[in-house]
Amino acid sequence: MTNIRKSHPLMKIVNNAFIDLPTPSNISSWWNFGSLLGICLILXILTGLFLAMHYTSDTTTAFSSVTHICXDVNYGWIIRYMHANGASMFFICLYMHVGRGMYYGSYTFLETWNIGVILLFTVMAAAFMGYVLPWGQMSFWGATVITNLLSAIPYIGTSLVEWIWGGFSVDKATLTRFFAFHFILPFIIAALAMVHLLFLHETGSNNPTGISSDTDKIPFHPYHTIKDILGALLLILTLMLLVLFAPDLLGDPDNYTPANPLNTPPHIKPEWYFLFAYAILRSIPNKLGGVLALVLSILILILMPLLHTSKQRSMMFRPLSQCLFWVLAADLLTXTWIGGQPVEHPYIIIGQLASIMYFLLILVLMPVTSMIENNFLKW
């Protein structure tokens, strides 16, 4: 008799994806982030579901309903902070996951990579709309500033913004629709993640060397399941340290003031995980130019396979490319810092230089360096 896990129609899918999946034997801990992202998504969906039971998406009661969750609902505070800080953990894992893909040349799996970029945009949209829901000062003004960027689109811009707002400013209609979208998006993300996995399993995983691992595969379970459990424990430990000891570390104090359309906060800024993109947006004095740079800063990932000029897939044996990769990482950290600073000297020029460096590194320096490395190896 065949094992039920190999014969049952549903179990068979699970078995081929998580148990008997042939996996390269040499994948490092950088390959843990996919499963960690899955955990973050499930955690956020579950906590979000319980928050939605007590939240009201009306401008008059939204802020007080969040206060009610924290003050009156049993364990409401921990659910709320696990949800908010869970989003931060999600983005840490996301950026590590994308960075891994760039370093080891995983973008040569075109379908997997492109679905991944779509996933990144979707998660960013969900996080942005979630930040609006508590209806604090930064929620309101963040929503106003970011949605207003669409007015830079020629001809249709103004109509588009008013259509998204559901009126002539960010108001009741905006909050209600943002709640609706914020509720549905994680399920769309989960569906996309399954497509992402489907495409990945068509080709099998990449590995640190970037060469075919068909000759050396091991079953996913128990080897990588136990490894993923270690990663998950570290993720949960970090999250709970944040939630229980510094729940507001990554938030903005302005969001503890109820939204007031008549009073603008001195420094409007998004959550920390959008600051690098916000810095790129602000570094261009023109509105449309800034919006284009903002979108391109993420959309540029789509071009990664086209910009790959090296004869080797991975950066493991390419020291010059490695240096540039870590310069890019430092550049993104610089811009994350700049995005949280006021628009004044010397932050303006640092932000502009960081933005130029970002595009220059990805579009010019890294492809040229790869060609130089090919020359060194006489390839």
Curated annotation (Swiss-Prot):
Intracellular or extracellular location(s): Mitochondrion inner membrane
TM spans (from-to): 33-53, 77-98, 113-133, 178-198, 226-246, 288-308, 320-340, 347-367
Cofactor binding description: Binds 2 heme b groups non-covalently.
Biological process, per Gene Ontology: mitochondrial electron transport, ubiquinol to cytochrome c
Top-level division of the source organism's lineage: Eukaryota
Residue pairs linked by disulfide bridges in the UniProt entry: none
Residues the record lists as binding heme b b562: 83, 182
Keywords from the named record: Electron transport, Heme, Iron, Membrane, Metal-binding, Mitochondrion, Mitochondrion inner membrane, Respiratory chain, Transmembrane, Transmembrane helix, Transport, Ubiquinone
Binding site for heme b b566: 97, 196
InterPro entries named in the record: Cyt_b/b6_C, Cyt_b/b6_C_sf, Cyt_b/b6_N, Cytb/b6-like_sf, Cytochrome_b, Cytochrome_b_C_euk/bac, Cytochrome_b_N_euk/bac, Di-haem_cyt_TM
Cofactor: heme b
Residues engaged in binding a ubiquinone: 201
GO cellular component, one term: mitochondrial inner membrane
Primary location recorded for the protein, binned into one broad class: mitochondrion
Extra information: Heme 1 (or BL or b562) is low-potential and absorbs at about 562 nm, and heme 2 (or BH or b566) is high-potential and absorbs at about 566 nm.
Function: Component of the ubiquinol-cytochrome c reductase complex (complex III or cytochrome b-c1 complex) that is part of the mitochondrial respiratory chain. The b-c1 complex mediates electron transfer from ubiquinol to cytochrome c. Contributes to the generation of a proton gradient across the mitochondrial membrane that is then used for ATP synthesis.
Self-association state and partner proteins as the record states: The cytochrome bc1 complex contains 11 subunits: 3 respiratory subunits (MT-CYB, CYC1 and UQCRFS1), 2 core proteins (UQCRC1 and UQCRC2) and 6 low-molecular weight proteins (UQCRH/QCR6, UQCRB/QCR7, UQCRQ/QCR8, UQCR10/QCR9, UQCR11/QCR10 and a cleavage product of UQCRFS1). This cytochrome bc1 complex then forms a dimer.
Listed name of the protein: Cytochrome b
UniProt organism field: Tragelaphus oryx
